UniProtKB/Swiss-Prot annotation:
<dbReference type="GO" id="GO:0017080">
    <property type="term" value="F:sodium channel regulator activity"/>
</dbReference>
<dbReference type="Pfam" id="PF07740">
    <property type="entry name" value="Toxin_12"/>
</dbReference>
<keyword id="KW-0732">Signal</keyword>
<dbReference type="GO" id="GO:0005576">
    <property type="term" value="C:extracellular region"/>
</dbReference>
<comment type="function">
    <text>Moderately inhibits voltage-gated sodium channels and weakly inhibits voltage-gated potassium channel. Inhibits the inactivation of rat Nav1.2/SCN2A (IC(50)=870 nM), rat Nav1.3/SCN3A (IC(50)=845 nM), rat Nav1.4/SCN4A (IC(50)=339 nM), human Nav1.5/SCN5A (IC(50)=335 nM) and human Nav1.7/SCN9A sodium channels (IC(50)=348 nM). The toxin delays the inactivation of sodium channels without affecting the activation and steady-state inactivation kinetics in the physiological range of voltages.</text>
</comment>
<keyword id="KW-0638">Presynaptic neurotoxin</keyword>
<keyword id="KW-0629">Postsynaptic neurotoxin</keyword>
<keyword id="KW-0960">Knottin</keyword>
<dbReference type="GO" id="GO:0008200">
    <property type="term" value="F:ion channel inhibitor activity"/>
</dbReference>
<keyword id="KW-1015">Disulfide bond</keyword>
<comment type="similarity">
    <text>Belongs to the neurotoxin 10 (Hwtx-1) family. 33 (Jztx-1) subfamily.</text>
</comment>
<feature type="disulfide bond">
    <location>
        <begin position="38"/>
        <end position="51"/>
    </location>
</feature>
<feature type="disulfide bond">
    <location>
        <begin position="45"/>
        <end position="58"/>
    </location>
</feature>
<dbReference type="GO" id="GO:0090729">
    <property type="term" value="F:toxin activity"/>
</dbReference>
<keyword id="KW-1220">Voltage-gated potassium channel impairing toxin</keyword>
<keyword id="KW-0964">Secreted</keyword>
<keyword id="KW-0528">Neurotoxin</keyword>
């Protein structure tokens, strides 16, 4: 029972975390911020962010 509840909570958190990223991706911004997709054909990450190889997401990098 506890596992099911945790799975549902984690799934909802993931949906809410990724939905703004999808929305922003469709707006053709000049650079990608946290959790934006990066790589070939995508805009580069903004300042203070780096494209994480393998995940192809912009991750904060000081």
């Amino acid at each position: 029972m506890k596992t099911s509840i945790l799975f549902v909570i984690f799934s909802l958190a993931l949906v809410f975390a990724l939905s703004p990223a999808t929305e922003i991706e469709e707006t053709d911004r000049a650079c990608g911020q946290f959790w934006w997709k990066c790589g070939e054909g995508k805009p580069p990450c903004c300042a203070n962010f780096a494209c994480k190889i393998g995940l192809y997401l912009c991750i904060w990098s000081p």
